[in-house]
Amino acid sequence: MNVKVRKFPYPFKCALSISSDIDNASSLDSFVQFMDFLNSENQTIYGPGLGLEVGNSFWFFNGSQSFQLSYFEGLTNKETLLAPIIRTYLQSKHIDTLHSWGNFDKGGFKRSYANKGMEVLNKYNFNVPVWVNHGINLNYQKIGDYPNMYGDDQNHSC
């Protein structure tokens, strides 16, 4: 008998993974509507929902000059209206990506921001399995072996 393990469960021959990204989400309402469109079959402003299982990302802080949805208001510890929604999506696993600790397009990242983010994750017992690591060069919290990536350098001030 010749038994083999298939790459994909029968009857499937391939797979596709889709992840949305909070970058430039225009408003709290549009973010929620888009998540509903992707993950339900409800009628949405985008049309009937697709009924998929699509994850998304979030930031704890917004240190950029542009409007960005985040857990905290700007660089403060004050929760936004999105914070409880983020917690709901983290609990349901519809948010599975930490878009680094925040958008720091103006620079200014400090380890205290990461500590505050960890406080929230620990308080609610959330595990975020994916880390998004992109951003302009002033986002020093990025991790890697390229210039301006200091997130894993314990000797750097960020």
Set out the residue ranges of the language-model regions.
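Catalytic alpha-helical scaffold of carbohydrate-active enzymes acting on polysaccharides/glycoconjugates
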Residues: 1-158
